[in-house]
Amino acid sequence: MVSESSQIVVEIIYAYPDQYFLKKISLDQPTTIQNVILQSGILAKYTEIDLRINKVGIFSRPAKLTDYVAHGDRIEIYRPLVADPKEIRRKRAAEQAQKA
């Protein structure tokens, strides 16, 4: 007996400070995060995405490209940090100290 695969719908998002790409995609399950990304077409639109460098997650929780997705999941592709958060805090603290 052949089992029917069921369809799931997931969202994929990639954001900049002033714009974002958000797409709902329907796929057969089981499927992985990497497959969702490849099927979405996002890599053609945003050529700076490198899956060897960019981290991914599901609903703000870190995940691996090989993790399976569930119906309703939001797959997020994260951009690399442009500044070190510790350095930014140091600069803010120094600015606050100068104002005081």
Swiss-Prot record:
SUPFAM superfamilies: MoaD/ThiS. Belongs to the UPF0125 (RnfH) family. This is UPF0125 protein HD_1828.
